């Protein structure tokens, strides 16, 4: 067996406790990594990988200076590693043999307080998911802000939350690893915990102990049994990662599914609400984020993820935006104050976790000093919501004053550097500093006094390691030495003496530096303890400042982009005049106007708008802008339209674009059908449905059949969900003749001899041409291909002129409705039996569509 060195024996013992983490092992002035950890660290950090002898074995080694930890740690964490930081727990100078070491912190992607790891505009959520038999639970904690949220629902709802909150790390029970991956994919940094962590008795115990309560009823989450399991798992994980200072986590909040608009993961992706991980496209958030503080940016992301359904709350936000637009002077004053606010939410969390440094405390004070003005402006506003917000704001004037009198304005980052405590705060500290800083002048003064008293002109003060400070007198003057001097040493030409005053000064000055450091540490610790009493107040301020910042941002957005206030109501209709796409209009070349469009939808007369028109004509933009206008209105923003009267929408569904899901073994068409099925299974009477090019992933007749069936299903469904249905199947225009609430519209095109001009205007009536070859020409297709395509198109049109496709579809629909079971045909008889044997109560819409498609093939 290989013999280990004492150091490697200690390393291996510690590493065995953290097998899943990359261990940074402090050795002198370096953090070292060994073995596989060294290989990973060298690759990720681009540092040198070497080998060293560890007893009789050789091992890989890679390291970096300890003072560079804040440079290298973020790179490891962002690469997805859990990093255990092992420090020296003793002073090597005072220890014989091996220094005691231990892990002082375990930093993971979801549990980080380092500013270089965190993004100021985004939360850093640690999430946990439990897949129960009846429901699923989820919890989200941002340890850097103290926000703790729980939710419970089906897998689709949990999936939606994961897409919106984008956790940096996800905790899952080991036995649910496979099931989780099947439902939610493998795009998350997952860590797998033992199953017992997700037990009810443990979760209840750890949560009530943390919040110091007898139950969770006061938080309104006691009935969310599955969600409570995940919240308990998160607190367990924090304990395991050496995060014990958690007094800033003061509450646990329920994400009330019924209070917010349903946005499934497809809708979030299709509407491009957030910037993609791979594509550099401009997102809605990029365009609408006019916030000035980190709290505002994070709040806006939350609002976008959770649009409101309560009419009164939506109107309250609109009222505040309206007030600011009518009182620009107040808006500018508030914005100026907001722009000078630091991240008080994360700073106060650092107080709780004892991670805050003196300079950050000064930043906290500087931010808090703007609160009284904001409070005053809100209280004087005469706007009910702003007045209430101002009333809830805490001035924290005592806190600001205490920080100001305790800390120097230019306090260092590291308390050990000294001069953090302000002059005049502590008389003892000032005296010690005086001794330390004015030692030479004191000795010069002492020398002058003693020389005058004794009449000895050539006195000299010096010191050595034997008896410290002394006065040296040449032999020619030793007869003048006073009686109170004590002789300590005789030299050839001189004698050395000490005095009472000199020994007293020596005692003071020798201990001054050490005492200064200890006293500054002690006074700083007292200040942090004082600030800790204000954690709740500062957290409340952070929440309110985030909300206020969002509303100021909405006002700025409306001014800059000509947005108008939507009129919200309890009805069902959507009426938009001159609506615009908020993102596309910002991407147009300077001077190019955006072509605005009107959209009207209701449940009585115009439930489904069938939009036809060529590719590139703007069909998809009209669909998306309608949803985005509704979404913006329900988060409290004004909208890019001349006017908008909007009934509350509770769900927004989109089936837009085409993409394969190769990793899950699904084709474009299968992805399309899955998304369509999700929509049809979840529509409500307040849903807004956007369908773009349904059926294009399969053959023409299959596609038309499925698109027709879906449109008919939506029309006949009791919910009468409002729908925008964009298609290049012009045959679907026939539906308006048979279904009273389906109306045809087209995106107008001006056709010339050799080309087409896309007018991008939505007009009544269907379109009979797709102009696909014109689009191919605009894309730069070779002339040969264009000419060949035109010839083929002409031949195909001639061959189909006898019975146009639209007529075939129309007649087929009539036949299916009127005489399907009247014909004495064995095939139809068999189909009839198949139909009657189907259990429509258990059949999903997609299965129904597939069955319908199969029957049509058998007929043809």
Question: Where are the regions that the model predicts?
Answer:
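Charged, surface-exposed helical/loop "interaction arms" that form contiguous linear patches used
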Residues: 353, 357, 367-370, 388, ...
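Active-site phosphate-binding and catalytic loops of NTP-dependent enzymes
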Residues: 109-118, 245, 382-385, 444-456, ...
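Charged catalytic and DNA/RNA-contacting regions of genome-maintenance
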Residues: 1-323, 336-339, 343-352, 356-448, ...
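Amphipathic heptad-repeat alpha-helical coiled-coil/stalk segments that mediate oligomerization
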Residues: 198-206, 262, 273-275, 366-445, ...
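Short hinge/gating elements
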Residues: 51-63, 212-223, 274, 284-288, ...
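Amphipathic alpha-helical
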Residues: 85-102, 544-552, 559, 726
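ATPase nucleotide-binding head domains, primarily ABC-like/P-loop NTPase cores
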Residues: 2, 19, 35-36, 224, ...
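Extended, charged coiled-coil "arm/hinge" scaffolds of SMC/Rad50-like chromosome-maintenance ATPases
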Residues: 408, 491, 495-529
């Amino acid at each position: 067996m290989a013999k280990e060195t004492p150091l490697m024996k200690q390393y291996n013992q510690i590493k065995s406790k953290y097998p899943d983490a990359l261990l940074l092992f402090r050795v002198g002035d370096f953090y070292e990594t060994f073995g596989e950890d060294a290989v990973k660290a060298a690759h990720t950090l681009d540092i040198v990988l070497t080998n060293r002898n560890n007893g009789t074995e050789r091992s890989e080694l890679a390291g970096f200076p300890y003072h560079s930890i804040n440079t290298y740690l973020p790179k490891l964490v962002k690469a997805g590693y859990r990093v255990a930081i092992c420090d020296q727990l003793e002073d090597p100078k005072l220890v014989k043999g091996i220094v005691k070491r231990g892990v002082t912190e375990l930093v993971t992607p979801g549990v980080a307080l380092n500013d270089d790891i965190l993004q100021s505009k985004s939360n850093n959520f640690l999430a946990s998911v439990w897949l129960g038999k009846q429901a699923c639970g989820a919890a989200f904690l941002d340890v850097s802000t103290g926000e703790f949220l729980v939710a419970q629902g089906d897998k689709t709802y949990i999936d939606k939350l994961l897409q919106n909150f984008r956790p940096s790390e996800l905790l899952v029970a080991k036995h649910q690893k496979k099931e989780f991956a099947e439902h939610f994919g493998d795009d998350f940094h997952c860590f797998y915990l033992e199953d017992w962590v997700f037990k009810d008795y443990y979760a209840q115990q750890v949560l009530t102990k943390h919040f110091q309560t007898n139950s969770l009823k006061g938080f309104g989450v006691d009935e969310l049994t599955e969600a409570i399991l995940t919240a308990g798992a998160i607190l367990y994980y924090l304990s395991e990662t050496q995060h014990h200072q958690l007094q800033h986590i003061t509450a646990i909040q329920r994400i009330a599914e019924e209070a917010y608009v349903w946005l499934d993961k497809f809708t979030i992706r299709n509407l491009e609400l957030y910037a993609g991980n791979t594509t550099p496209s401009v997102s809605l958030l990029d365009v609408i984020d006019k916030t000035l503080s980190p709290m505002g940016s994070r709040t806006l992301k939350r609002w976008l993820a959770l649009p409101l359904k309560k009419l009164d709350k939506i109107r309250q936000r609109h009222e505040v935006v309206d007030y600011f637009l009518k009182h620009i002077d107040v808006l500018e004053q508030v914005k100026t104050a907001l722009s000078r606010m630091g991240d008080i939410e994360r700073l106060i969390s650092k107080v709780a976790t004892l991670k805050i440094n003196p300079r950050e405390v000064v930043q906290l004070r500087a931010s808090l000093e703007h609160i009284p003005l904001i409070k005053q402006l809100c209280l004087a506003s005469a706007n009910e919501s702003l007045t209430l917000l101002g009333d809830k704001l805490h001035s924290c004037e005592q806190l600001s004053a205490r920080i100001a009198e305790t800390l120097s304005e230019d306090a260092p980052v590291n308390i050990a550097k000294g001069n953090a405590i302000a002059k005049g705060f502590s008389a003892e500290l000032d005296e010690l500093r005086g001794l330390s800083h004015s030692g030479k002048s004191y000795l010069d003064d002492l020398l002058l006094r003693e020389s005058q008293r004794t009449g000895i002109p050539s006195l000299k003060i010096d010191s050595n390691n034997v008896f410290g400070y002394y006065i040296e007198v040449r032999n020619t003057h030793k007869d003048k030495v006073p009686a109170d001097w004590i002789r300590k040493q005789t030299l050839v030409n001189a004698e050395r003496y000490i005095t009472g005053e000199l020994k007293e000064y020596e005692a003071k000055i020798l201990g001054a530096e050490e005492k200064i450091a200890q006293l500054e540490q002690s006074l700083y610790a007292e200040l942090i303890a004082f600030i800790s009493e204000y954690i709740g107040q500062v957290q409340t301020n952070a929440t309110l400042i985030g909300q206020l910042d969002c509303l100021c941002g909405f006002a700025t957005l409306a001014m800059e982009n000509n947005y108008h206030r939507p009129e919200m109501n309890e009805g069902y209709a959507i009426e938009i005049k001159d609506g615009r796409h908020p993102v596309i209009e910002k991407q147009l070349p300077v001077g190019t106007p955006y072509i605005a469009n009107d959209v009207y939808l209701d449940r009585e007369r115009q439930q489904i708008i069938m939009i036809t028109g060529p590719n590139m004509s703007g069909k998809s933009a009209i669909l998306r802008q309608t949803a985005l206008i509704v979404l913006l209105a329900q988060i409290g923003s004004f909208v890019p339209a001349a006017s908008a009267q909007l009934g509350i929408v509770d769900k927004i569904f989109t089936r837009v674009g085409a993409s394969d899901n190769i990793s899950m073994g699904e084709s474009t068409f299968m992805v399309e059908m899955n998304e369509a099925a999700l929509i049809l299974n979840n529509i409500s009477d307040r849903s807004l449905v956007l369908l773009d090019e349904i059926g294009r992933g399969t053959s023409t007749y299959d596609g038309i059949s499925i698109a027709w069936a879906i449109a008919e299903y939506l029309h006949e469904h009791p919910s009468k969900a409002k729908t925008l249905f964009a298609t290049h199947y012009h045959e679907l225009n026939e539906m308006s003749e048979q279904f009273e609430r389906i109306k045809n519209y087209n995106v107008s095109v001006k056709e010339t001899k050799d080309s087409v001009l896309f007018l991008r205007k939505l007009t009544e009536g269907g379109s009979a041409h797709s102009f696909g070859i014109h689009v191919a020409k605009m894309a730069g297709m070779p002339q040969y291909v264009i000419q060949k395509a035109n010839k083929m198109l002409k031949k195909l049109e001639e061959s189909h002129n006898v019975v146009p496709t639209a007529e075939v579809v129309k007649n087929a629909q009539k036949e299916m409705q009127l005489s399907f079971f009247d014909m004495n045909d064995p095939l139809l008889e068999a189909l009839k039996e198949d139909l009657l044997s189907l259990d429509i109560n258990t059949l999903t819409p997609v299965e129904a569509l597939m069955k319908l498609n199969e029957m049509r093939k058998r007929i043809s």
